[in-house]
């Protein structure tokens, strides 16, 4: 944020050529941010990554209102010779309504975040609120504090028209920039004149631009969220069903050794293993939900600062580990908190569920796993449920048990107490008289003693003898026989229906393309299911589709709000179309920049698109407003459009350059900054296309739509209705 503010200040200094004017603009940034934080505090929001990201994103745009105000004042004072006090009042009043409309337009487009749901809503609503409140505070400051500071700081500054010879390095550089800018402005005016006279050029360019945007949109691909490099790796290892805990531990040690070969010591901090389920009473809602037994576990790897990309190590481990341990199953889980939230509790990006009571669903789920694993871009495809774990079934002789005063429930309870401790079925406590701390008292057969089938048969079973009234411990082998079989170690249900989950992740391909291939597979396999069974795709695919749909609806409503806002401001239904018709060029720039930088279309980049559209609308509104004023003074639509472009080129370029340069550090990104990088790249791409569109296509559209009103005062639509 500080780097962005510094670069923004540098661009303003270059364009205005005055450190005093730059100071006037930069004063509004911290005050607007603090005002936004105050409002967020009263709304119950916290200072977190998303609110800070929103404020960092807003740094470039916060200077917009103050920049336009001081540029307009500076033009009236330095170029037209108006006294400073009069220029301050007239300059602020002249753009008060247009800047209000442009600020509200930016705020309107950010209202689309309210249509989000799920994790995306809780992530991006604070970001949107931070930007909106900062923008509103910036407008209030530009109406109050900025004119005051202009009067205080600029009164001792010499005018550009005073004819003084520049002294000092900065003054000479500023004068040289002004000469270069005037040549640019003259060249722009000549080029705009050509566009306005040769009307076929703009439609041809527009068609080419839209075609480019359509191609880039197809090539960009879609994701729910960019991959975050948190410097952590979480590897899930599953040994064959029935593997003993000590064997599992040896496997994990061998896997650790292989990880150390792949990840050098200078890049890793530590490696931690978590094998099996918790031994004592523990709420498994707080544990890793994908761990199902003693043959299962997680290896967590923490990397040092400055490490090589985590994704490269993960890609290498996906190649090395299955080759070294072909009997074991490996899959990587989300290690960073953002991706864990986006997965919404699932251990993978994609969860394809086979639901229903039919026994054939297991075979369909296994075929589904094989089909998914063959899809390009799918990695770590595995069936979560383990259905072939070895087990002993105790077949109780009910007649013999009844003779001993037992029933099946009593025998089962005794087995449970012996193998899993009495803590589960009959918890007892002992309170330390000194400290008052209660402790569990539990009875359990030591695991090392249950080392054979005979030892299992010697499990004590309490036998109630009605004759003597005494309780005599008997042996389990007296009332039961044992049979080897297989059993499912875990069972899942959704809406009471049994579920088989096939989990998978994506690597080297966008989620949207993978989702399209998954839908083809599920459509084919759905035909093999009996009535009452179904296949459901959840996880990030579902979240992505919902978020894209809701954001699209939100953007549609935002466009309607912005249009109606301009209708009220311009008092006509026609002029707002000049602004609306220029927005597709902004979207074309966004998708083009995303393609060039290798960034997919995702929720953060859509948030950047929202901001770029808002800024483009704001600049177009100011230009159209100035052109309308010129036409009301009696100029033709051609002359008004040319004059508006010639006059507003400086604030448009200054605002766009300040935002683009301020976004560059965020766009470069780094480890853990991928979400902000996608957002910033979308803003930069949108503004790179929106700026020439505002300066060239908007005047062209204005001249075309208003050419019938040449030399005539234009009445508002509501005035026309009244007449």
Located regions from the model:
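Transmembrane helices with small-residue packing motifs
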Residues: 41, 45, 113-123, 203, ...
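Helix-loop junctions and hydrophobic alpha-helical segments within the transmembrane domains
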Residues: 70, 76-101, 124, 548, ...
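Solvent-exposed, membrane-proximal periplasmic/extracellular interface segments of envelope transport
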Residues: 246-344, 399-425, 434-435, 448-449
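Interfacial helix-loop-helix hairpins and adjacent transmembrane helices
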Residues: 79, 85-89, 119, 125, ...
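Transmembrane alpha-helices and their membrane-interface boundaries in multi-pass membrane transporters
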Residues: 11, 59-73, 96-115, 122-174, ...
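Signature of alpha-helical transmembrane segments and their immediate interfacial
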Residues: 95, 166-226, 273, 324, ...
């Amino acid at each position: 944020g500080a780097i962005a503010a510094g670069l923004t200040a540098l661009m303003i200094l270059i364009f205005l050529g005055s450190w005093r004017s730059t100071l006037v603009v930069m004063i509004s940034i911290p005050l607007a941010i603090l005002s936004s934080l105050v409002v967020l505090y009263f709304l119950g929001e916290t200072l977190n990554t998303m609110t800070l990201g929103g404020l960092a994103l807003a740094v470039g745009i916060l200077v917009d209102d103050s920049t336009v105000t001081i540029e307009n004042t500076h033009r009236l004072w330095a170029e037209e010779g108006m006294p400073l006090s009069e220029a301050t009042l007239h300059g602020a009043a002249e753009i008060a309504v247009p800047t209000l409309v442009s600020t509200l337009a930016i705020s309107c487009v950010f209202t689309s975040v309210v249509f989000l749901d799920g994790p995306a809503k809780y992530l991006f609503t604070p970001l949107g609120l931070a930007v909106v409140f900062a923008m509103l505070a910036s407008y209030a400051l530009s109406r109050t504090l900025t004119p005051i500071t202009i009067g205080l700081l600029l009164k001792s500054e010499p005018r550009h028209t005073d004819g003084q010879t520049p002294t000092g390095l900065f003054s000479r550089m500023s004068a040289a920039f002004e000469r270069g800018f005037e040549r640019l402005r003259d060249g722009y005016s000549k080029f705009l004149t050509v566009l306005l006279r040769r009307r076929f050029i703009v439609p041809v360019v527009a068609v080419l631009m839209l075609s480019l945007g359509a191609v880039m949109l197809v090539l960009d691909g879609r994701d729910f969220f960019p991959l975050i490099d948190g410097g952590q790796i979480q590897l899930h290892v599953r040994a064959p069903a029935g593997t003993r805990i000590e064997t599992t531990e040896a496997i994990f040690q061998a896997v650790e050794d292989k990880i150390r070969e792949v990840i050098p010591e200078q890049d890793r901090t530590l490696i931690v293993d978590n094998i099996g389920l918790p031994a004592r009473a523990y709420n498994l809602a707080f544990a890793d939900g994908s761990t199902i037994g003693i043959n299962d576990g997680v290896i967590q790897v923490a990397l040092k600062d400055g490490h090589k990309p985590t994704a490269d190590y993960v890609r290498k481990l996906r190649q090395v580990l299955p080759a070294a341990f072909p009997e074991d199953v490996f899959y990587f889980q989300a290690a960073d908190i953002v991706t864990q939230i986006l997965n919404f509790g699932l251990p993978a990006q994609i969860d394809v569920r086979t639901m229903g009571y039919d026994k054939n669903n297991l075979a369909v789920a296994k075929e589904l796993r094989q089909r998914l694993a063959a899809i390009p871009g799918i990695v770590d495809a595995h069936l979560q449920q383990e259905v072939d774990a070895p087990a002993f079934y105790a077949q109780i002789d009910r007649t013999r048990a009844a003779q001993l005063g037992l029933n099946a429930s009593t025998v089962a309870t005794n087995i449970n107490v012996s193998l899993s401790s009495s803590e589960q079925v009959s918890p007892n406590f002992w309170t330390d008289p000194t400290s008052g701390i209660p402790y569990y008292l539990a009875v359990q057969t030591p695991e090392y003693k249950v080392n054979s089938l005979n030892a299992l048969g010697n499990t004590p079973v309490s036998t109630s003898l009605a004759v003597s009234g005494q309780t005599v411990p008997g042996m389990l082998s007296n009332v039961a026989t044992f049979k080897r079989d297989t059993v499912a170690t875990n069972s899942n249900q959704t809406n009471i229906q049994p579920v088989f989950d096939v989990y998978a992740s994506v690597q080297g391909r966008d989620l949207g393309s993978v989702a399209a291939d998954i839908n083809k597979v599920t459509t084919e396999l759905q035909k093999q299911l009996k009535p009452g069974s179904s296949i459901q795709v959840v996880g990030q695919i579902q979240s992505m589709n919902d978020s894209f749909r809701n954001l699209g609806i939100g953007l549609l409503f935002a466009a309607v709000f912005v249009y109606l806002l301009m209708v009220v401001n311009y008092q006509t239904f026609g002029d707002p179309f000049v602004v609306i018709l220029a927005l597709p060029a902004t979207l074309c720039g966004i998708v083009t920049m995303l393609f060039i930088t290798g960034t997919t279309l995702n929720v953060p980049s859509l948030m950047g698109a929202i901001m770029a559209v808002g800024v483009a609308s704001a600049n177009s509104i100011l230009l159209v407003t100035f052109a309308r004023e010129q036409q009301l003074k009696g100029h033709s639509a051609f002359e008004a459009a040319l004059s508006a472009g010639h006059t507003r080129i400086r604030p448009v370029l200054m605002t766009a350059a300040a935002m683009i340069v301020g976004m560059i550090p965020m766009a470069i990104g780094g480890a853990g900054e991928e979400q902000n990088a996608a957002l910033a790249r979308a803003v930069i791409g949108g503004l790179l296309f929106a700026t020439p569109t505002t300066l060239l296509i908007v005047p062209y559209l204005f001249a075309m739509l208003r050419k019938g009103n040449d030399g005539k005062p234009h009445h508002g639509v509501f005035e026309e209705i009244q007449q």
